[in-house]
Amino acid sequence: MGSKSFGNLLDLASGDLLDIPQTPRYLPRVMTVPGIISDVDGYGISDGDSDVISLPCRERKIIVANFLPLNGKKDSETGKWKFSLDNDSPLLHLKDGFSPETEVIYVGSLKTHVDVSEQDEVSHNLFEEFNCVATFLPQDVHKKFYLGFCKQQLWPLFHYMLPMCPDHGERFDRGLWQAYVSANKIFADKVMGVINLEEDYIWIHDYHLMVLPTFLRRRFHRVKLGFFLHSPFPSSEIYRTLPVREELLRGLLNCDLIGFHTFDYARHFLSCCCRMLGLEYESKRGHIALDYLGRTVFLKILPIGIHMGRLESVLNLPATAEKLKEIQEKYRGKKIILGVDDMDIFKGLSLKILAFEHLLQQYPSMLGKIVLIQIVNPARGSGKDVQEARKETYDTVKRINERYGSHDYEPVVLIDRPVPRFEKSAYYALAECCIVNAVRDGMNLVPYKYTVCRQGTPSMNKSLGVSDDLPRTSTLVLSEFIGCSPSLSGAIRVNPWDVDAVADSLYSAITMSDFEKQLRHKKHFHYISTHDVGYWARSFSQDLERASRDHYSKRCWGVGWGLGFRLVALSPNFRRLSIEQTVSAYRRSSKRAIFLDYDGTLVPETSIVKDPSAEVISALKALCSDPNNTIFIVSGRGKVSLSEWLAPCENLGIAAEHGYFTRWNKSSDWETSGLSDDLEWKKVVEPIMRLYTETTDGSNIEAKESALVWHHQDADPDFGSCQAKELLDHLETVLVNEPVIVNRGHQIVEVKPQGVSKGLVTGKILSRMLEDGIAPDFVVCIGDDRSDEEMFENISTTLSAQSSSMSTEIFACTVGRKPSKAKYFLDEVSDVVKLLQGLANTSSPKPRYPSHLRVSFESVV
């Protein structure tokens, strides 16, 4: 039995969404039933519908995340739910970066289960009181979605952990993947229920919702959509092991802006797009941009910040002052090294504690003078790996304390319980050094919080009995593998796996001079205070507005099924070439010129066999037999190959090697471009290209009579691209005084004589026709790559300049839906062949058949 396909899960989850009309300007009553989109697009709406709430024309931000920034509990006496804002959630403080007039709506799940019978009431109250739209997932879906696919598959993979065997991680499970898609669909339904397309900007957060953009983009082509990934993004070698890798990549690419904490994470994402989807990227005015089917997808690299005011208000609490005095008295005479981490296999807890043990071994003078206080936050997931990490941590702490401790000295203090925010802040404020030793982490804001607490407040200083003018100090020891490390340049960076080096770094941090500690602290505090969560939200929001600015200037349509859906966006004047209309124009005309590229136009680019098909030869022969037609193949291929492949077409013109050689028909001689025949430069270029070929596996040299081309389509994409840039620079330097042009095309670097291009040769052919009194009133030009763009541009320029009084119908057409100077497109080579057959049938005399046997194929075409 064939395997079941899961590529169309979007359709299964969503039903038919494409036929629903555009969202009107009103906000429907909050929905509570997953999968039902009521009153979003005019269904069941009558005049005076009481359920419809008018919306003012006001900018809104819809923040979508797995969890709402709320805390909730059910009152045991009244049975009523009580909710409050979670001030520890960064999402709650995003509004600090928006203008005061901006309305913020949150969409997400609650952190606690609400019975189905209570969901209607809870939904209504949350929206009315907090502007929150609750997403209720069925319990089985939530378990498979969050604890299953997110925590057992995506989370480990994004942190470079592969399930090499059953004992180390969960293998890919299609059932969990289906739950992930279903959960994302439920989130999409909620967003669709409140979206106001023209005013709203949607900002999606983290790996839990990576296919949500596909649902939204499929439903609303011009939705303004941003995504920020709060976890690492793995290298392509790790990511490519994921069976649903393309679905997730295309999901993110359906956004207008994708955010990452560091360039490393963005670089890995770009590498995946390049290697798996064949996309190219460039830097545009300081912004990294991917060209994706006519849309420009921008990347944003900016680490998140913290809410300074929130943390400072905690430092001013009376409870904090009391805890400060308590800790200060308890550890008087000792320097505190502080760690605050989740109980997680990626946080490097055991490595950190081992490094502290090495510190005590290597520097026995520190015994009794330093203490490592490790606060352990509750684990976010559950499983054998968490239990193993906890056991290893406890065993290591016990061994160290038994060996180095005494009745009044405990070297390692492990606090494994929920620690109130005020207590953590007190430990931050009194710690001489803070160490974050994670082996892999997305951002980690512990160093930020530590630095702000070390800066203190007047109230805290009063509690400690220190002057406000006293210079502040702080020291950070940070793993190289966490997102905040690049931002805090004054930190001591370490490889967490090198336990000895970490121990030495801790010793350096403790014994560092106060002046150096002050300088490092000042540098960090300035960065943290100027890059808070408000700055982060404002910067991302501004870039999202910029990225979605031209949505209404292009024509958009969706292609692909299921989670392979993507949006094509092109110029409003760019449309599919109608074979019927082209044939009609051909029939009306008296003199015609047709210019055709070869590779990618008459023969598929990916085809190993480069000979033209029998259908192509038959159509070309029929077109060439018409004395009113001038047909040319304009190609970068050599004249020998083209002559051999197109030999059956006696009257076919050929412009080989981009027009360096031209032949009007098979019986005529080859003409050169009239340029100098001095090709001595090839003796310089060929050895250089050979050197790059030897050092770039998968590359090769194509030697033409007039040009040399270095191909790297079979090389590693990143390395081949890098080598091509280097080769381009090398050749441009060497050939600066030679009459040649060095071009970089799609996976090639080409050196050819100046004054040779497809645009110039088509212009010369048309000029010759005009000089001979053959003024074409019908011109077709078809190509598929960059070199053909010059043809499209030159044809209209030549005809308008030399025959302004003549009315000529010009059909410039590119193969494939992509940005082009042509006005028309055909999807693939087979469409080009159908067009040529349609034109050929018009030129050729029709055989006489009985009327009842005549069949028209135009409707099929």
UniProtKB/Swiss-Prot annotation:
**The keyword GTP-binding is annotated on this UniProt entry:** no
Q: Which reaction does it catalyse?
A: D-glucose 6-phosphate + UDP-alpha-D-glucose = alpha,alpha-trehalose 6-phosphate + UDP + H(+)
Annotated region (Glycosyltransferase), positions in chain: 59-546
Query: Which Gene3D superfamilies would you find in this protein's record?
Result: Glycogen Phosphorylase B, HAD superfamily/HAD-like
Determine if Phosphoprotein is one of this entry's keywords. Answer: yes
Write down which residues bear the modification named Phosphoserine: 5
What's in the keyword line of the UniProt record? Glycosyltransferase, Phosphoprotein, Transferase
Q: Name one GO molecular function term.
A: glycosyltransferase activity
Q: Which GO terms describe its biological process?
A: trehalose biosynthetic process
**Phosphothreonine occurs at which residues?**
32
The Enzyme Commission number assigned here is: 2.4.1.15
* Any Pfam family matching the protein: Glyco_transf_20
Family from the record? In the N-terminal section; belongs to the glycosyltransferase 20 family. In the C-terminal section; belongs to the trehalose phosphatase family.
* Protein name per Swiss-Prot or TrEMBL: Probable alpha,alpha-trehalose-phosphate synthase [UDP-forming] 10
| Phylogenetic lineage | Eukaryota, Viridiplantae, Streptophyta, Embryophyta, Tracheophyta
